Design a protein with these regions (language model features):
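A short helix->beta-strand "capping" segment at the edge of beta-propeller domains
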Residues: 37-55
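Beta-rich, blade/repeat-based domains predominating
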Residues: 52-68, 97-116, 141-159, 190-212, ...
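Conserved beta-strand positions in repeat-built beta-propeller and related beta-rich domains
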Residues: 64-65, 70-77, 116-122, 158-164, ...
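Beta-propeller domains
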Residues: 72-92
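Structural signal for beta-propeller blades
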Residues: 78-81, 123-125, 166-169, 221-223, ...
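Short loop/turn segments that connect beta-strands within beta-propeller blades
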Residues: 84-88, 129-134, 172-176, 227-232, ...
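Hydrophobic alpha-helical segments and helix pairs
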Residues: 127-183
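Blade-level signature of beta-propeller repeat domains, shared across WD40, Kelch, NHL, RCC1
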Residues: 296-332
Length: 332
């Protein structure tokens, strides 16, 4: 786990330099002096999906600190790959049967021995046993949507973004424990505008014990704060965050900063958040020659795992770039 969130004032931070993480040699992380905070990690490591097949692009990633393994989902067959940080190759761990329409494993998170997966166009949310790979539960939201990313709060609730329908989907802790139930729909309009045929809400993270969510709309290049009342979804409050325009995909909160992944250009923009998350200012931008068409990110020990979905070119083999996390910076 990273450091506790650093609370900032509402004063905007000045933009900082773009940072290149070379695949070999010293890393130019801001103020890192070519090392990862004393952990000895100074170069990007690249993991390869084996097999890598055309049309089965990787998209989601999740890290399990207990087993020291990470998982990568794909959107062609729904196959979920697995590897440890010591490996160089990701291999299939969960392969949906041919009769199962789980052809998309998009956003994913690990919590309490379970792997939660957003099912894209299937409209399903899957819960797997992280030890055996067995399907423990499946929750349906109906057709017409694209379940893109999800977050599990400290209370055990799950919130899922829908890129095509203007709503969040909420699984309560009780539903997950029972393994059944109908996901609750939380309307995000009119505050968050949806454009038909485009990817709207995408990445999502939780703050303040799950009472606050931060989401990104890819098409409108906007970040939003959603204050949640888990007992009354109609009471939610949505506020647009004053932030640079970013066509973000995956999001990550680390050391109190918000990391936003974009595919074109393939970068990770690190944002400093104000005290009440009303503003976000660029701290630095991470990139690497191994990154292309990047989709999302996870924090794994002293690395950031960045998935190279590469939907534009789909060059084989598909890869995951493990960037050095770098030492934390002081915020003023």
């Amino acid at each position: 786990m990273g450091r506790a969130p650093v609370e900032l004032t509402d004063r905007p931070e000045a933009p900082r330099d773009r940072t290149l993480c070379p695949a070999a040699g010293p890393v130019g992380l801001a103020r890192a002096s070519g090392s990862d905070g004393g952990h000895g990690i100074s170069a990007t490591k690249v993991f390869t999906l084996d097999p890598s097949t055309a049309g089965n692009n990787p998209e989601g990633v999740a890290w399990d600190s207990r087993s020291q393994t990470f998982f990568v989902g794909t959107v062609g067959t729904g196959t979920i790959y697995r590897a440890s940080l010591r490996d160089t190759t990701l291999r299939p761990f969960i392969t949906p049967p041919a009769a199962d329409p789980a052809d998309s494993a998009v956003g994913m998170k690990v919590s309490r021995g379970k792997l939660y997966v957003a099912g894209g166009t299937t409209g399903s949310i899957y819960v797997y046993d992280i030890r055996t790979g067995a399907l423990m539960a499946r929750f349906e939201t109906g057709s017409g949507g694209f379940l893109n990313d999800l977050v599990v709060t400290e209370e055990g609730d799950v919130y899922v973004t829908d890129s095509f329908r203007p709503m969040l989907w909420h699984l309560t802790r009780a539903m997950i424990k029972a393994g059944t139930g109908t996901p609750q729909a939380i309307n995000v309009g009119p505050e968050i505008a949806y454009t038909t045929g485009q990817f709207n809400l995408n990445g999502i993270v939780a703050r303040r014990d799950g009472r606050e969510l931060i989401v990104v709309s890819t098409f409108s290049e906007s970040l939003f704060r959603i204050d949640i009342d888990r007992h009354n979804s109609a009471a939610r409050k949505i506020t647009k965050i004053d932030a640079p325009a970013l066509a973000g995909d995956g999001l990550l909160i680390d050391r109190g900063q918000l990391l936003v992944v974009t595919g074109d250009p393939a970068e990770v923009t690190v944002l400093n958040l104000s005290r009440h998350d009303s503003r976000a200012r660029v701290s630095k931008v991470l990139t690497d020659s191994s990154m292309h068409g990047s989709s999302t990110i996870a924090h794994a020990e002293n690395r950031y795992l960045v998935v190279n979905a590469d939907f534009t070119h789909s060059a084989l083999p598909f890869t995951v770039s493990a960037l050095p996390r770098g030492r934390s910076e002081s915020h003023h």
